[in-house]
Amino acid sequence: MMQKGYIYKGLKPVYWCADCNTALAEAEIEYQDDPCYSIYVKFPITDSKGKFDDLGIDLSKAYVVIWTTTTWTLPGNLAICLGPNYEYTFVKVEDEESKSFGQYLLMATELVSTVMDAVGIKKYSTVGSFLGSELELIETDHPFMGRKSPLIVGDHVTLDSGTGCVHTAPGFGLEDFEVCNKYKGMFKIIVPVNEKGVLTEEAGDFAGLKTADANKVIAKRLEDDNTLLAMQKIVHPYPHCWRCHEPIIYRATDQWFCNVDMFKAETVKAIEDVQWIPEWGEERIKNMVNMRSDWCISRQRRWGVPIPILYCEDCGKVIVNDETIKAISDMFRRESSDSWYSKDPSEFIPASVKCECGCNKFRKEMDIFDVWFDSGCTHAAVLQERPELSWPADLYLEGCDQYRGWFQSSLLTSVATTGRAPYKAVCTHGWVVDGKGEVMHKSKGNVVLPEEVISKYGADVLRLWVASLDFHNDVRVSPEMLKQLSEAYRKIRNTARFILGNLGNGDGFNPDTDMVALDKLSDFDKWALSRLDSVIEKVKASYEAFDFYLAYHAIHSFCVVDMSNFYLDIVKDTLYCSAEKSEERRAVQTTMYIILDSLVRLVAPILTFTSDEIWKYMPHKSTDDLRGVPFNQMPEKTGVEISAEFEAKWNKIHAVRDDVLKALEEKRTAGVIGKSLDAGVTIFAEGADFEQLSGYPELAQAFSVSYVNVKNGADGEFKGAVEGVSVTVEKAAGEMCERCWSHAPSVGSDAQYPHLCARCAAVMKLDLG
């Protein structure tokens, strides 16, 4: 960056912590609401350049009024800045009770009523009208420093507050500094406050005062001289040091800077080539880069990464060339950057290196790098220096405050040196707060410690909590929320446990030899796989978009609604009562294996320990990598073919099933039936509904009852949510099979198994031989 001319040393106002005695970056600033006094100050006009001759104004009574919240900066005032296109006017004070009675006060026309209310002047009139540009170079006297403060113009002036006449102290403000520099040779920048926050001799009578103490003393001086128009106590956000939390100041000092303007356009282009998650992050960092000034990269601290710059002992010229860069880099590589502090330049700089003046003796720069410059170089120090790693990084992940911190410093150093961003994607997160949305503090007793959560619920519940929330915003955590998440976790785990149990019983299920082709699966099985395909698609898309909470909700809903509440419930009869190696049972096992194999892969990024446990116990294909889930690919969709007619059929079955379950519950409450298999159900429907439902032989299994009859009509006892369909529930006819618990006319038809239905008797004979 130095070789490209991006780095320079210069005098410029920077954030300065007088307590830490160092410059600060914007990312090292935190704002707190502070009480302070704002003051309105009168600067007497001494040379109007003839602009006011036609107004009949007594110049000895004419003043420009400024407003400031930092009284201590007034000794550094060199000018008053006006907006070139704003209208200004004189306010003649006609309030006899005012100390300013009979005076003419210049301010922005738009702010007259606001200012007069603030200073308590009730009677006044206005005289004259001027654009700010017409008043340029009119002279005023500084109220107490014995020098001129001319009127200048600048586009940074606003009418949001104050008087429209801006107190300009270039040693204490960047905009002040820049606008004064436009007036070439007119101003000599002064900084009448030292590194400890104490006013210097350049502050005149106020030398030796700390800035906080100077506020009161200067205000008293202004009041005694009748140049203090008004003083008000206000509370406003004020910058504080992030380390010591003390108020900071803006102070012009000699620092090392990076000229961001030289590669700003290139940086904005690089931003557009990055995936920002969430998307608004792109606009946010673009605005920050476009609006930022040069980057102050030096700090005045006793430890840190040194700025490897040398100065000529004789003429003070900065010495940086290929030889010094190589010599210092080699030393740092061998002995670390700490060697900078222990060695004399003569020990590591080649004797051939000389200043243009001929001197070969040098002194070291003792400032250190801004920590953000330091951390912003990690992409080069870590990724580019290690062949086993790739550059740029796939992802930078941090809190949303890092748009002005690590994300931006990394971006600037990378674009400056390589022309592109150091990352392919950037993802930001919010902060963790308690269940009420309040910041956690030990004193409040609302801190939730991760180790306590892990001890009580396990690490996967903590991971599930993280995944269950939209982390782009602040996320809440409380014992109640974690308890709810533990229940959700148990639902997912129990789904896997049920499937594992039914794949492992008997001789077990071997996916290499026992799988049933998709086209031979029942409609129940095909429906389950169609739901799985939908989940696979949604979860993978959610992971790609870093929307982990959408992935979690899709998985949880699938396990609870589609599996536990429906599919796994209705296939129990097949699993428990069909012959162990029958095609219908193998079909259900095939479906469950596909579901479990997909589910364990889908949950692995969130429930890492649980997925690993499932992987160890589940059956595997010979092509699986048995080392663990992460060594295998995410699942692909099963490819089961589902028509629109099929989907409509199952939507109807689900809707009618909900009504049937409610009707069963009514009869159970009335004591007519016990379990659902004690019931027989008659569905009444008309027209297309009758034709559709009467063609479903699977209804008894879908409703978990002994039998279902479908009749044309509307005579059902229970009318539910499905329009045109009603339900009647009766105690099932026939004896109960002691094996499958269904009531069937065939119970007792087999002499060998008189207490079983015909199906169960046949299975017993097949399995027992």
Located regions from the model:
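Residue patterns forming the tRNA-binding/recognition surfaces of aminoacyl-tRNA synthetases
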Residues: 1-75, 94-96, 137-139, 147-152, ...
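Short metal-coordination and nucleic-acid-contact micro-motifs, chiefly zinc-binding Cys/His arrays
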Residues: 13, 237, 308, 348-353, ...
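Acidic, turn-prone loop/beta-hairpin segments
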Residues: 14, 18, 25-32, 362, ...
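Short cysteine-rich clusters marking metal-coordination/redox-active sites
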Residues: 17, 241, 312, 352-356, ...
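Cys/His-coordinated zinc-binding microdomains
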Residues: 21, 300, 316, 358-359, ...
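Protease-associated
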Residues: 79, 86-165, 174-178
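C-terminal accessory/binding modules appended to enzymatic or scaffolding proteins
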Residues: 150-152, 720-756
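Secondary-structure capping and boundary motifs in well-ordered enzyme cores
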Residues: 320, 361-372, 388-405, 442-445, ...
